[in-house]
């Protein structure tokens, strides 16, 4: 989400809430725009700002340096920012301006219409996911089904606990999701979707199930966030072999408001313990820049699910231990990008990507995990960061 003044709204051509899905352009009691834009209304405005190649490259370098300082050696990037950025990303990785290995989801950050056009163009080329090398790879086709847990704007089947009139924002109908997901699946792509609320998770699950029924083939589809689910959705995720990508670091920032917004549903929110108990391979991510990219925040969130300000715990029964959390960040992350044969664990024959931490996190008290630092980051056997 983002806040824009009157001049920015006028310059961007946003004239009223009717231009987008209900709830994306926030209005006051008199129906006037407040300046708060959510989801595709917000990303629509991103397209109105033009960056130079030099500005892009500077931002790539800055992001790379931040990730290396956190000990991150591989990342999954959720979107491209305009057609020109795919080539810039590739060049930055080729020249090693970006040293962190990049697995890129095929999603256009400037909204639904752009994403559909973007995905159709990739499908029409005849290529499919996995194109690239160990430093820059094109991966899953991705769409964005709903909003966020913190908005709150994720699409839920039941109203929010704090407001019986709200059930979030759903950006794709079932038919629209079916069209793009089945098309991408048939073209040989693995598919993914940003789906947070249980209503949104049901949409993407249904599309994937229909795609797999029409065209059974080896695949490794995934759901980004997969925030609020239930036993029925959990069983369907397992049956389809889907990889959920939960973000436990969110609890560090939002556990208190999660309890307010979703009530007892927090017991199946980013349900890491349930994934483990059911043999579902889930990979943890930060969702940076929504929160910091520091994996220590995610590890802490996975183990405590507690709010850093109030101490509120959201769904304590879903807490997991340190070794399981580490595996979800490392091996499972590689599994989510179909690269577990070359990275995700330290063993002979795999890429020499390592991090040396300031202390042994297997012995560090849970309450101190967030203070652990990366002392050294190594990629391809080269020291790329030292504290």
Regions found by a protein language model. Give the residues of each.
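Divalent metal-binding segments
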Residues: 1-123, 139, 143-200, 219-220, ...
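Short secondary-structure transition/capping segments
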Residues: 5, 10-16, 117-128, 150-157, ...
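Acidic (Asp/Glu)-rich catalytic clusters
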Residues: 92-96, 126-133, 213-216, 237-241
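Short, well-ordered loop/turn elements at secondary-structure boundaries
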Residues: 98, 132, 137-139, 145, ...
């Amino acid at each position: 989400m983002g806040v824009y003044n009157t001049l920015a709204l006028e310059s961007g051509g946003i004239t009223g809430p009717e231009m987008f899905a209900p709830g994306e352009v926030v209005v006051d009691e008199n129906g006037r725009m407040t300046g708060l834009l959510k989801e595709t209304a917000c990303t629509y405005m991103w397209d109105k700002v033009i960056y130079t190649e030099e500005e892009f490259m500077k931002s790539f370098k800055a992001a790379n340096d931040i990730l290396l300082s956190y000990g991150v050696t591989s990342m999954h990037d959720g979107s491209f920012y305009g057609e020109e950025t795919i080539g810039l990303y590739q060049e930055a990785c080729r020249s090693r301006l970006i040293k962190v290995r990049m697995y890129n989801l095929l999603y256009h950050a400037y909204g639904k219409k752009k994403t559909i056009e973007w995905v159709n163009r990739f499908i029409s080329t005849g290529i499919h996911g996995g194109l690239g090398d160990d430093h820059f790879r094109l991966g899953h086709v991705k769409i964005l089904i709903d909003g966020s847990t913190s908005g709150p704007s994720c699409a839920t089947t039941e109203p929010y606990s704090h407001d019986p009139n709200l059930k979030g924002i759903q950006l794709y109908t079932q038919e629209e999701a079916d069209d793009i997901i089945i098309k991408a699946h048939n073209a040989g792509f693995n598919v993914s979707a940003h789906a947070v609320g249980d209503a949104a998770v049901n949409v993407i699950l249904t599309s994937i199930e229909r795609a797999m029924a029409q065209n059974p083939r080896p695949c490794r589809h995934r759901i980004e966030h997969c925030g609020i689910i239930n036993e029925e959705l959990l069983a369907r995720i397992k049956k389809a072999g889907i990889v959920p990508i939960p973000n436990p670091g969110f609890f560090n920032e939002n556990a208190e408001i999660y309890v307010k917004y979703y009530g007892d549903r927090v017991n199946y929110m980013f349900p890491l313990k349930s994934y483990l108990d059911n043999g579902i391979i889930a990979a943890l991510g930060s969702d940076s820049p929504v929160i910091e990219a520091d994996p220590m925040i995610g590890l802490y969130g996975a183990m405590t699910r507690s709010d850093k300000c109030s101490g509120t715990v959201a769904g304590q029964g879903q807490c997991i231990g340190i070794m399981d959390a580490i595996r979800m960040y490392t091996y499972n992350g590689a599994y989510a990008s179909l690269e577990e044969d070359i990275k995700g664990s330290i063993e002979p024959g795999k890429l020499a990507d390592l991090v040396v931490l300031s202390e042994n996190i297997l012995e560090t008290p849970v309450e101190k995990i967030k203070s652990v630092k990366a002392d050294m980051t190594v990629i391809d056997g080269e020291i790329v960061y030292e504290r």
